[in-house]
Regions:
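Carbohydrate-binding surfaces of carbohydrate-active enzymes
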Residues: 1-246, 254-258, 277, 287, ...
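Short, well-structured beta-strand segments enriched in hydrophobic/aromatic residues
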Residues: 175-176, 263, 302-328
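Aromatic-lined ligand-binding clefts that engage carbohydrates, nucleic acids, or primary amines
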Residues: 133, 253-280, 307-311
């Protein structure tokens, strides 16, 4: 929730910078679809939006009462300006001639400005390295991470045509804000730093694992287990492979190093769920997305440490198992209808329950839990 609130605050700041305003007619359009390149056009229309261009759809009310034509574009009373306008309601719509943009990598962007400062929100699909050129002038270039709560100077270079080239590395399915700051509250450019000394320690001691269903489920949960790995492939027990609920995993490890500048617990990957981490009784936060890494520097201590990880997955596996059981033996109750055969139609698959042939999905933590300590700070905190 905090991540979403921070993103929405920045995405509500200033005014949007958009490329295209499209009038799609007065018919209620169902949806806009896209391929793996994100922007493809409107269902039933031959319009295809070139990659790298942002667009909004405007209706007749906007065109008649709010929008004003400015050259080839539109301007709205709230300050939003669209450089190009196109009527795509015709049977053979024609877009204005748009310069081709060099867009590389599976990512999307949103641009907002207040006239002095500019904010670009970048989100990737898979691993993505984003490189883009912007006229920054004398402004500083910063990376704001709404997930890690960090703010640091970006890596940039000047191009031959007087623009600023910014390179941003995004984690798997991750995001970042690139801020061109023209105010007094700036982050100083990165100085040449001493190489950080990373140390990695795998937490190899066994885990005591307890299982719990949601309080509404009255069935008895699986008994306590001792595991070396926290992935469900480490067991062949039918009841555990289809478990849906919360696993409380407790282990210990010894740390003999000096007090680090930074310390992270790397969970590798949490399948089909989230992980809440406590170190020595200190709440270190919730890992719910890549890079599945939490800051534990304030909780880590020399000597013996206790770690507790509460892993909660979705109901999917239990629902798949229950559709294979007689109704009297099912743990869950669902308003969805179960099916005996695989469903070929994709809308049926989305809007119905599971079938007996559906495969379970992985759960738990993939790989070893690793403690990463850093002797020199990787980035300034603010």
């Amino acid at each position: 929730v905090g991540y979403l609130a921070r993103c929405q605050a920045l995405l509500s700041w200033g005014r949007p910078v958009m490329d295209l305003a499209l009038y799609a007619g007065d018919e209620v359009y169902t949806h806009w679809h896209g391929d793996e390149n994100a922007q493809e056009g409107m269902t039933g229309s031959p319009v295809r939006i070139p990659r790298g261009y942002n667009f909004d759809i405007v209706n007749r009310e906007v065109m008649e009462t709010r929008a004003k034509r400015e050259g080839a574009g539109l301007r709205l009373p709230d300050g939003a300006y669209y450089r190009f306008f196109a009527d795509v309601s015709a049977s053979n719509p024609v877009l204005p001639t748009l310069p081709r943009r060099d867009v590389e990598g599976p990512f999307r962007s949103v641009h907002r400005t207040d006239g002095v400062n500019d904010v670009y929100f970048l989100c990737g699909e898979g691993d993505a390295e984003v490189v883009f050129d912007v006229k920054a002038g004398e402004r500083s270039v910063e990376i704001w991470d709404a997930l890690a709560l960090t703010r640091c100077a970006a890596e940039w270079s000047d191009t031959a045509d007087g623009r600023t080239r910014v390179r941003v590395s995004l984690p798997v399915d991750g995001s970042a804000f690139v801020v061109f700051n023209g105010g007094d509250d700036r982050v100083e450019p990165k100085a040449k730093s001493v190489p950080a000394a990373h140390r990695y320690q795998s937490l190899a001691e066994p885990w005591e694992v307890e299982f719990a269903y949601h309080p509404a489920i009255k069935a008895k949960p699986p008994a306590k287990r001792t595991w070396n790995m926290l992935h469900d492939s480490s067991t062949e027990e039918h009841q555990l492979k289809f478990f849906s609920g919360t696993m409380t995993c407790i282990s210990h490890f010894d740390y003999g190093g000096e007090n680090p500048a930074e310390a992270y617990l790397d969970l590798g990957m949490v399948h089909n769920g989230v992980a809440h981490v406590y170190l020595n009784g200190v709440d270190c936060g919730l890992a719910w997305c890549a890079p599945w890494k939490l800051d534990v520097v304030r909780a880590l201590r020399r000597g013996r440490n206790e770690i507790v990880i509460r892993i909660t997955n979705t109901w999917q596996n239990r629902l798949i198992l229950d559709c294979r059981l007689p109704e009297a033996k099912r743990v869950t109750k669902s308003c969805l209808h179960y099916y005996d055969e695989n469903k070929e139609n994709r809308w049926t698959r989305r809007c119905s329950g599971y079938c007996r042939g559906d495969e379970r999905v992985p759960s738990g933590i993939d790989g070893m839990v690793v403690l990463e300590t850093v002797a020199v700070p990787l980035r300034p905190r603010k």
